[in-house]
Curated annotation (Swiss-Prot):
Cellular localisation: Mitochondrion matrix
Record's cofactor remark: Binds 1 zinc ion.
Protein name (database record): Mitochondrial intermediate peptidase
Biased composition (Low complexity): 37-46
UniProt-listed Gene3D superfamilies: Collagenase (Catalytic Domain), Neurolysin, domain 3
GO terms for MF: metal ion binding; metalloendopeptidase activity
Species for this entry: Scheffersomyces stipitis (strain ATCC 58785 / CBS 6054 / NBRC 10063 / NRRL Y-11545) (Yeast)
Length: 812
């Protein structure tokens, strides 16, 4: 599934989105940008015009991209006859001059720490000695938050995505230093008291903007949620526990893909029953590398790497072998489960310290859902609806392909028999048989991937955004050192087509070897504090990328995917061999790109004067709406068949071919949603009151595994009561207690789609309505008011149980 990486903002100085992220001289001049705008909602008849073709080639043709980079450098006078890669003009990562080396990152963090401490000192002095100090206090608090987030966000990105271990080590060190200081600020009583007094002084608030007051209230709220009323000893304990949770979370995410064992032993007599002789031969070839076994003469060790385990799960008719392989693939290491148990215990401890019933109550207090009871009700109703709507029917289709099933048995089987009769290790095996049977009467399907190159999809998205938002993508050449892989990372400016002004920048790496699809906010939009003279243009030019007037910093987002390059040769690019065939995507991967671009456009359009509530810095159970909504566009033939072209012939994708592939794709659609609801329920249970009670009675021996198995038994449908898969669920940390957000936002997105875009997904009128009611506000407006405006339903503005009922009704 496609999940964006977002770090939850439970404290006022906590980092921005992570895990859901240009120097002006390298931006094309306004006269170079494709002009013209239209109020028409007509969809483009072709994405083959000059700007789209250029954008497509930037991503699909490595030689074209290299030529573009070289040409841009030569045109701007950066080099003479040397290729751009040998340019003497250097930059740092994301055009931050400090980030040219790992050591530079550490120095940047130390300098930023000094700057932050100096700003705090001046704020605390000015607020008492000068009336202007009270008026500028919230702006400076926001600037303080931005100074720290500017370091922590880029460090988090480097820690997760950078290919160099030296950079990763420096980022880890940086993150720990800055995060500890942020936690100290979150419990700084003097900072809080000044803010509280300012917000309660009507003579001051009368002179503040509405956004300044909103940000002030937001920061005050989070101070209070960080235990500001505790005694000094308790506050220090709070900071220490919060820091420990951060470290545990980092360890949890780093070990998420590790298995308890990379070998699975099965009886030799079962192995001999395997029908695939080539597979048997391949497995036997690994035996010399297998770890020693007490029963080596009676067993065979199957490696849990490469295609072997997945081939067994889809083709092996011996259930006992599938069972052992499936459990082994889903078992986390004992250390990973211990890490999970520890951060769950510490979260429950924090919630108790702050006077909340549970960590879930703490997290949901200011979210759309308001409390865990509403979430559990939403999920329970959703699961009931899904079971009635199609889950049972989908599993029944699988059940009939069990090796021991007869038509009579299928007809006589009860719903419980059917659900219990299909185990999790049966899913892929039976689905493979179902798909083969479904394909028997179909002609050989043409490969749809050839219509879906990366460049085609990016260019198509630009055309779509131009149609509905009047913004487009413009490629930008990068300086040496500006990206983590100059040969691979593409940079595009998001440009308002009516004004030709930049809204922000995207750094796109579709071929990362180490990161699942993710959206990282590197810099948030923010108006510079030039009027109160707490920062200067000259200094900010070295750190961020500014707008044309040099009065605001532009948002910078990095989108990372782990797509495989086509025709990767063994010689490699350093021998002068480049891929000529573009990277071709599956429909699921297209959904992923659309999803992540939804987050990106939220950051680009949701520009605010203060960074704390810009772009994706809104309620966590609202932040997925723009990304989930984009999946409705990627699934609509009126969109995909307009933008998808064969990478060689330029032939458009036919609706018939798309429909055939989509039919294959959604065979277990209801089951997939149900499984996601189980994960959301697990997230609630592991952050519930029961956990608080359990650790109060026996802190040391808390174990999440029995809780996981108990919930699986209760909710059924591919129930897992054997493995420790919950240790492989990254969002238990990054989305603790709010994983339901995806399902809630999917329900909201369905309402938005049907209310605005279902009639015409290329509609400028619908796009403007959506942009002005939801996207442009960032986090400065109550989400329920945004929805009430977008859907023209005043009942939603209350955000009560009735509003939740309206959203949940007939959804999904």
């Amino acid at each position: 599934m496609r999940l964006s990486r977002q770090l939850l903002r439970s404290t006022p100085f906590l980092t921005r989105a992570k895990p859901v992220s240009g120097k002006v001289s390298h931006f094309r001049s306004r006269t170079d940008l494709k002009g013209g705008s239209s109020n028409s909602s007509k969809s483009p008849d072709s994405v083959g015009d000059g700007a789209s073709a250029h954008l497509r080639h930037i991503f699909d043709d490595q030689k074209y991209f290299n030529s573009f980079t070289k040409s841009a450098a030569e045109t701007s006078g950066k080099v003479s006859s040397l290729p751009a890669i040998f340019s003497f003009r250097r930059s740092g990562l994301f055009c931050n001059d400090n980030l040219s080396t790992p050591h530079g990152l550490i120095d940047f963090s130390k300098n930023s720490l000094r700057e932050a401490k100096s700003l705090v000192e001046s704020m605390l002095h000015d607020v008492k000695s000068d009336p202007a100090g009270r008026l500028s206090y919230i702006n400076k608090l926001d600037q303080l938050s931005d100074i720290l987030c500017r370091v922590i966000d880029v460090a988090e990105f480097i820690r997760v995505a950078h290919p160099s271990q030296k950079w990763v080590n420096a980022a880890q060190q940086t993150h720990e230093i800055m995060f500890e200081y942020m936690n100290q600020l979150n419990t700084n009583v003097e900072l809080y008291q000044n803010l509280r007094d300012i917000l309660s002084d009507s003579s001051v608030t009368a002179q503040l903007t509405e956004e300044e007051i909103q940000v002030g209230e937001y920061l005050k709220q989070d101070f209070e949620r960080s235990g500001i009323h505790m005694n000094p000893s308790a506050r220090n304990n709070f900071v220490a526990i919060t820091q420990e949770i951060s470290l545990l979370g980092s360890r949890f995410n780093n070990e998420i893909h590790n298995l308890k064992s990379y070998w699975c032993e099965i009886p030799r007599y079962e192995f001999e029953q395997l029908e695939d002789s080539n597979l048997k031969k391949e497995i036997l070839g690994y035996q010399s590398k297998a770890p020693p076994s007490k029963h080596s003469s009676q067993t065979i060790s199957i490696p849990l790497v490469g295609h072997i385990p997945f081939t067994i799960l889809t083709t092996c008719s011996i259930e006992s072998i599938r069972r052992e392989i499936w459990i082994s693939l889903h078992n986390s290491s004992d250390e990973q489960i211990a890490t999970l148990n520890n951060f769950l215990k510490y979260r429950a401890t924090l919630a108790k310290m702050l006077g909340y019933k549970s960590f879930s109550h703490y997290q949901l207090e200011h979210k759309m859902a308001k409390n865990p009871e509403n979430v559990v009700t939403f999920l329970t109703n959703l699961q009931k609806s899904l079971r009635e709507k199609g889950v049972t029917e989908e599993i029944k289709k699988l059940y009939q392909y069990r090796d021991d099933s007869t038509i009579s048995q299928v007809q006589k089987a009860s719903t419980e028999d059917i659900i219990d009769g299909v185990k999790p290790w049966d899913r892929d095996y039976l689905l493979e048989k179902l798909q083969k049977a479904s394909n028997k009467n179909l002609e050989e399907l043409e490969n749809i991937n050839e219509y879906l190159s990366v460049g085609t999809i990016v260019a198509g998205l630009s055309e779509l955004f131009k149609s509905i938002y009047n913004v487009e993508f413009v490629p930008v050449a990068t300086l040496k050192g500006e990206t983590w892989d100059q040969n691979q990372v593409r940079k595009v400016a998001v440009v308002d087509d009516s004004t030709k002004k930049k809204l922000g920048f995207l750094y796109l790496d579709f071929w990362s070897p180490k990161v699942l699809p993710s959206h990282f906010t590197i810099v948030c939009s923010r108006k510079l504090n030039l009027d109160i003279k707490s920062e200067t243009k000259d200094k900010m030019r070295q750190l961020v990328q500014l707008d044309e007037d040099e009065t605001s910093q532009l948002p910078v987002i990095s989108l990372i995917c782990n797509f495989q390059k086509s025709n990767d040769g063994h010689i490699g690019r350093f021998a002068g061999v480049e891929n000529e065939k573009p990277t071709l995507l599956s429909l699921n991967q297209v959904d992923t790109v659309f999803h992540e671009m939804g987050h990106a456009m939220h950051s680009m359009i949701g520009r605010t004067d203060l960074h704390n509530l810009s772009g994706t810095r809104c309620a966590t159970d609202f932040v997925e709406l723009p990304s989930v909504l984009m999946e409705s566009f990627s699934k609509d033939p009126r969109v995909l068949c307009k933008i998808a072209k064969h990478y060689e012939t330029g032939e458009p994708l036919s609706p018939k071919l798309l429909a055939q592939h989509q039919t294959q794709k959604v065979m277990l659609d209801e089951c997939e949603t149900y499984m996601q609801s189980k994960m959301a329920m697990l997230d609630q249970v592991l952050h519930s009151e029961d956990v608080v009670r359990t650790i109060s009675e026996d802190f040391a021996n808390f174990d999440s595994t029995p809780i996981y198995h108990s919930l699986e038994s209760k909710l059924k449908v591919f129930a897992d009561t054997w493995s420790t898969w919950h240790g492989k669920f990254p969002h238990l940390f990054s989305y603790g207690a709010v994983y339901y957000s995806y399902l809630l936002d999917r329900a909201i997105a369905e309402k938005i789609w049907n209310g605005l875009f279902a009639h015409d997904p290329w509609s400028r009128e619908a796009g403007e309505k959506y942009k002005n009611s939801i996207l442009k506000w960032g986090g400065t407006r109550d989400p329920w008011e945004c929805l009430a405006d977008a859907l023209e339903n005043d009942e939603l503005s209350k955000g009560d149980s009735r509003a939740m009922e309206i959203i949940g009704k007939d959804s999904l």
